[in-house]
Amino acid sequence: MDHDTLLGFLGLAEKLKCNTRHSWTSSGRHESVAEHVYRLMVFAWLVRDEFPELDMDRVMELALFHDMGEAVTGDIPAFEKTGEDEKTEGEAQEEIAGLLPGPRGEKLREIFREVRE
């Protein structure tokens, strides 16, 4: 992967640090999408031995990328999400996966498909 592609993708991921969610932290401020993803990753790691039947590497991938589309769309709370929002989110995910060449982009498309299921 060339440097421009790598840095471009990381720049997009960085937006998740600035995009806030509808939920609040225990300190009373809005949680960023990146903070939400981090905590979910920690949770998945902590319980990985409790679910030996699961492919925990896949669970970690799903946790890592499940809200990546929000770097483009912003947070849309699940309880407010419409069919049009889901379409927009899918388009954003395709745009994001398209930033990565070859197998890496295909892998991300697979992850996004599974997240939507």
Question: Locations of the language-model features?
Answer:
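Alpha-helical, largely C-terminal catalytic domains
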Residues: M1-E117
